[in-house]
């Protein structure tokens, strides 16, 4: 019979194995729920037998009392910084210096890595056990952050494998992925906590918490990139091979590393990473180029506080300081009034930025922003530039406050802010030109009425020339009237008239989505269409009736109910359906229990990409066969249909034990 000690050893080994697969190999083999179950089992056994708890147990990541201050750590091998280059010419000059100093360049190979935008840390392992973690500090002395680092699941408390040196100091970067950063700030805004300016600040703030229980709640992760102290063992004489060895021992290493032989290949790597930067999921601020051979590194040596054999090739800065010239207010499709900072133009991440969103009145208050202030602007990837913070030390005397308008800046209607909402809205509806433009652009968009050739610039002209006031007016346009628009010849005008005629035949779900009801996206529109079947039934539905639709709660139900209660909206709908002639196939309303179908009465979720039919068509077919089509997976879900590139919904369905079929099986059951 297995002893308690053996069971504890087996559980710890299994959990470390799954941590290695998840954090290092990026290939988990069990769902999170199974990992959590094993952890609960281990924790229960250790609570029953506290004398058998070991420091390297996966349960011992959190548990120490809060510190009053951090102790100092002196680095036995200094943590040096890197010299920076900011353009190709400077990198080529670095490459020339390297070549000039070497006796021979035959063996010269560069190892190219990502320059992570986090916090550099030192991890000291003794006989494979993590005994200390420290910040870089000034390079000679850092702070002891061992208790906090132990909470980071990507960092192994015990190395795996053989031939581990007696004392090994691993160096790397602790950072916060974008998704985790957004989650932390969302929670902070909800609770009135501290909102971080960027992921790096959030990572640094998380690591420097005196209470490790706070750090444990932050989704920090780690990549290693080098070694400091090495005693009682050997490592390969290639930097790349060292990283591969670290990975084998259970330490996470970035998979974006490449060995190259020429400066041209380095530049190609740099530009490829720069292009991929928005999709990485975490912040980087450049690439690091290192001579791969340890022998050549030793020949090159160091200068001052940086190695001669490595350089950081930085991307254009993502943050810059500039001045707020003014704040203007834009009106969106739903009437939301958004303040926009007009800035002294400044280059940020290679783009000239002159505007930045301020989101809403609460954000202006949080920033303490005044017109004339010096501010820090951040732009990451394709994200709209944002004001990160006000530089109060640079505030001039002549600043003035930002005043939210009492009337819509476009139509003059009163504005309102509903209690509990952050957004201020114009009450003008379709009489507001700004709302009209955005509402019409949404109405004709591909996923709505799908009017081929009706672009934003055409809508702008139609509204400005007062040819169109409501969606129905679009369908009354003639080729002659359209020909008067910029860059619109007779043939293009006739093609657009034909496209409008074709768009009159649609689906109930598309029509609902096109109306632009607040909080009603494609999935919700499809659910409403499937549940009610007819427009009349939906218009007459109560808030309680609406909440019977899968994934429709009180907020969405109230928005839908209020939309149809508004007489002007009902008039627009009558005009579209009765006068213009927009129509869709009549539903065959049959009770689910009367339908002889494998989908009847089941709650079905679609995920991934379907190749044989559109998502809307699939939802309509399933609904006609008695299914309730939902947009999210829950315990109430009966069936998940997984197309290509299915993601988190598939994983959750598998975790909950929900039946999963592919598109081919769905088509077979549909009788296709």
UniProtKB/Swiss-Prot annotation:
Q: Which domain of life is it from?
A: Bacteria
Question: What top-level class of enzyme does the UniProt entry assign?
Answer: ligase
- CC terms in the record's Gene Ontology section: cytosol
Asked if the keyword Metal-binding belongs to this entry, the reply reads: yes
According to the entry, every stretch annotated as the BRCT domain falls at 594-672
Alphabetized, the UniProt keywords read: DNA damage, DNA repair, DNA replication, Ligase, Magnesium, Manganese, Metal-binding, NAD, Zinc
Q: Which reaction does it catalyse?
A: NAD(+) + (deoxyribonucleotide)n-3'-hydroxyl + 5'-phospho-(deoxyribonucleotide)m = (deoxyribonucleotide)n+m + AMP + beta-nicotinamide D-nucleotide
Q: Where does Zn(2+) bind?
A: 408, 411, 426, 432
The record's listing under Pfam families reads:
BRCT, DNA_ligase_aden, DNA_ligase_OB, DNA_ligase_ZBD, HHH_2, HHH_5, Nlig-Ia
What cofactors does this protein use? Mg(2+); Mn(2+)
- MF-aspect GO terms: DNA binding; DNA ligase (NAD+) activity; metal ion binding
Q: Which InterPro entries match?
A: BRCT_dom, BRCT_dom_sf, DisA/LigA_HHH, DNA_ligase, DNA_ligase_AS, DNA_ligase_CS, DNAligase_adenylation, DNAligase_N
The catalytic residues are: 115
Positions binding NAD(+) in this chain are: 32-36, 81-82, 113, 136, 173, 290, 314
One GO biological process term is:
DNA replication
So what EC number does this one have?
A: 6.5.1.2
* Function of the protein: DNA ligase that catalyzes the formation of phosphodiester linkages between 5'-phosphoryl and 3'-hydroxyl groups in double-stranded DNA using NAD as a coenzyme and as the energy source for the reaction. It is essential for DNA replication and repair of damaged DNA.
Family per similarity comment: Belongs to the NAD-dependent DNA ligase family. LigA subfamily.
Q: Which NCBIfam families match?
A: dnlj, PRK07956.1
Entry protein name: DNA ligase
